[in-house]
């Protein structure tokens, strides 16, 4: 769910979450017995203070996102620190925009049984760890191109995209760190 405080994941929900308001979205998720997890909270900004109103309502934080560090290189590290300071469970996710990215980020859970309730309990008690590998930068560039085409972007936007795509290709070729 896209909200004014960022993206929010609703886990274990049975129905749609039809709102852009963070607080209403959390209420709907919790009303369905779900978990509200803040997704890639530092992808665009280092400002953790903006998230303070959200903390008491959250069930966890996505601390490994295979795409988040494209815009802010230490986004995942900042998310992990935030989760630790706020004492919130940690989650991992792919944020897949294409089939090749599925499974690049994930949450390993140590549950007593293979039931939704057992997994949910394990997640809330911190019996999980976020893991993954970084998505190729080219996939981020490609999804941005698709977004521009869908929204009827202006020609200058494509020039900016070309520079971003070149940067992404260079990262895929030369950057070795994860």
Question: What function would you assign to each model-found segment?
Answer:
Residues 37-45:
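Aromatic-lined carbohydrate-recognition surfaces of secreted/lumenal glycan-active proteins
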Residues 2-16, 23, 27, 44-178:
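Charged catalytic cores and adjacent phosphate/nucleic-acid-binding surfaces used
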């Amino acid at each position: 769910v896209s909200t004014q405080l960022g993206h929010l994941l609703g886990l274990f929900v049975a129905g749609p979450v039809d709102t852009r308001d963070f607080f209403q979205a959390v209420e709907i998720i919790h009303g369905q017995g779900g978990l509200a997890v803040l997704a890639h909270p530092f992808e665009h900004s280092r400002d953790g203070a903006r998230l303070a109103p959200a903390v008491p309502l959250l069930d966890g934080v996505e601390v490994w996102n295979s795409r988040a560090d494209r815009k802010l290189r230490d986004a995942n590290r900042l998310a992990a620190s935030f989760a630790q300071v706020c004492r919130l469970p940690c989650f991992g996710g792919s944020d897949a925009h294409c089939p090749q990215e599925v499974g690049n980020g994930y949450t390993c859970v140590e549950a007593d049984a293979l039931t939704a309730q057992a997994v949910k309990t394990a997640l809330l008690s911190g019996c999980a760890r976020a893991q993954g590998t970084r998505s190729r930068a080219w996939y981020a560039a490609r999804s941005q191109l698709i977004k521009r085409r869908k929204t009827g972007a202006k020609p200058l936007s494509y020039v900016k995209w070309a520079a971003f795509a070149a940067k992404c290709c260079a990262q895929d070729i030369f950057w070795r760190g994860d």
